[in-house]
């Protein structure tokens, strides 16, 4: 095998169009991201059809910019990695069809990547010496998982949400208290001005050994609290609501992740996904894990949110295992972790 394997990666599962060039799964030569946040902000969330159209408008330029920044041409690329699920089907199709076209035209192998696997692999970029096994907490707008990574590309899901993802709950609560979209960063910011002990919102604790999550109850409790305040004409302290809600979500995420580590006897937790940039989650996880002798690994913000570099990293580890994807592959919006 060549000393250096160069992956051109493409990500378009939601509202970021991204392309990257990644070498050997850990070195990022370029990572171009065209965000649509300003486009969707006025709608209070991502509009799937609008997202697809925006991907179509920019994908060619984004891929070319990624190649140019890396000082590469397609001749220098060994394989093309692309997200094929989970995500918004229309958005996924834009990146997938573009990648399939490149693979067909150049004869380069295509590697379909699970978006969640990409988030986990972002840690290999930031932590060059990181190797499995380790635990990973994946928290984003659409996904919440506790994953035991046994080996490269081999996962065991120990816990997942039974309803709303953590990031989805953040967005809905932010909208309810008038903070707008995207909710996660705005709740994180205003929470710094609030008292996290001001309101006791419930935590979902299941009565068996499951490590699953449920955030719909917390979200509903916040909405009920707001409705009662409005009906009584009482003032609502947005900062206190945000801080108390955030703490209730973070406490459950941290507790279950530490339990998972103890059950598998691992001493490393990697964090992935957009909600991993939340300051309360970072601080609480580091503080509580220190008490248990568990190391916490958290990538920088740009690698927590959707990006193609993480897809390139995951694609590399698939490539060296000899896995290739047929050009007949289709988008799978509800793709499960570990499915191929």
UniProtKB/Swiss-Prot annotation:
EC number(s) given by UniProt: 2.3.1.234
Molecular function GO terms recorded: iron ion binding; N(6)-L-threonylcarbamoyladenine synthase activity
This chain belongs to the protein called tRNA N6-adenosine threonylcarbamoyltransferase
Entry similarity comment:
Belongs to the KAE1 / TsaD family.
As cofactor, the record names: Fe(2+)
Q: Kindly list the places in or outside the cell where this protein is found, as annotated in its UniProt entry.
A: Cytoplasm
> Could you tell me which species this protein originates from?
Clostridium botulinum (strain Hall / ATCC 3502 / NCTC 13319 / Type A)
InterPro entries per the UniProt record, alphabetical:
ATPase_NBD, Gcp-like_dom, KAE1/TsaD, TsaD
Query: Principal place where this protein is found?
Result: cytoplasm
Swiss-Prot/TrEMBL catalytic activity:
L-threonylcarbamoyladenylate + adenosine(37) in tRNA = N(6)-L-threonylcarbamoyladenosine(37) in tRNA + AMP + H(+)
Q: What class of enzyme is it?
A: transferase
Q: Which UniProt keywords apply?
A: Acyltransferase, Cytoplasm, Iron, Metal-binding, Transferase, tRNA processing
Which NCBIfam families does this one have?
gcp_kae1 (TIGR00329), T6A_TsaD_YgjD (TIGR03723)
Per UniProt, where does substrate bind?
Answer: 138-142, 171, 184, 188, 278
An annotated GO BP: tRNA threonylcarbamoyladenosine modification
Q: Which residues make up the binding site for Fe cation?
A: 115, 119, 306
Q: How is the cofactor bound?
A: Binds 1 Fe(2+) ion per subunit.
**What role is this protein assigned?**
Required for the formation of a threonylcarbamoyl group on adenosine at position 37 (t(6)A37) in tRNAs that read codons beginning with adenine. Is involved in the transfer of the threonylcarbamoyl moiety of threonylcarbamoyl-AMP (TC-AMP) to the N6 group of A37, together with TsaE and TsaB. TsaD likely plays a direct catalytic role in this reaction.
* UniProt keyword Lipoprotein present: no
What SUPFAM superfamilies does the record tag this protein with? Actin-like ATPase domain
Tell me which GO cellular component terms the UniProt record holds: cytoplasm
